[in-house]
Amino acid sequence: MRQQYIARYTAISKSSDAEKLREWALQLSEDYLPDGWVRVKSSAFTRVAHNPRRQLYYKQYLTRSPAFKLKAQVRGSRATRARLNAEALLLAGIDAPHNVLWGKLPSGGEYLFTVEVPGDSITHWLLEATTAHDATTLRLRRQLLSELGTFIGRVHATGFLHGDLSPDNILAVRLQDQFRFALMNNERNSRRVPTPGRLLLRNLIQLNMLSPDDVGRTDRMRFFRAWRRQLRELSPVEAKILAVESYRRALRRLPGRAGSAH
């Protein structure tokens, strides 16, 4: 079904539907919800809405401080970076939101329409969908962690570094007995070859930001072993340092656990 929507929206900027999207963008930017749209919780610097029937997302990038405006002149606006970074991921065979239409608003902000990506966040999968202790659920959880490790390893092996690789920014859906993953919120992504170890560490810390009560060391090591197999240029010592340090630093940053890492 999603492929049908992607095909439909590929040339939408040249169709009459584009005018409807621009009209919606103006309405949504003024906090008016057109029929079929629902507001989605987002950061203080964005406004997000979802149209389930049309499988579309709208994201408005609100204007920020003069310093951010200056940065946008040098690096490109957040909307532009989100669009280009998603396209770069898709070109490399890594799933991300497909862009539909983008533009500027009279207020000075920018907006971006994308096709809905199927799936639930890794947070949902680990904290809700795979918490039972029966054999079937345990196998599913192990499969999820192993295939997630392979996916993130492939992302890093191709030089991509996510701006905020939190479990909420990775969606997963199970299709034909395999998990398919997608990266969301790609505004701050970068690409470096070779990939600096400190940036790999930052991504791994972000991904480790789940309580050890919910995701134990065995789970984390299952992910890490699969991740490591995709980055053969890392020596065993480098890989061990990344595994240990990402876990320790994430543990220190978790609320109520400062100083508890051992």
Predicted regions and their residues:
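Juxta-kinase regulatory segment immediately upstream of eukaryotic protein kinase catalytic domains
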Residues: 1-37
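Flexible, glycine- and charge-enriched loops at secondary-structure boundaries
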Residues: 72-79, 134, 138-141, 197, ...
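C-lobe/activation-segment region of protein kinase-like
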Residues: 179-252
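AlphaC helix of the protein kinase catalytic domain
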Residues: 122-135
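Activation-loop N-terminal segment of eukaryotic-like protein kinases
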Residues: 172-178
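Conserved ATP-binding subdomain of kinase catalytic cores across diverse folds
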Residues: 23-123, 153, 157-158, 162, ...
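Hydrophobic residue at the +6 position relative to the catalytic HRD Asp in the kinase catalytic loop
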Residues: 165-172
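Conserved alphaE helix
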Residues: 139-151
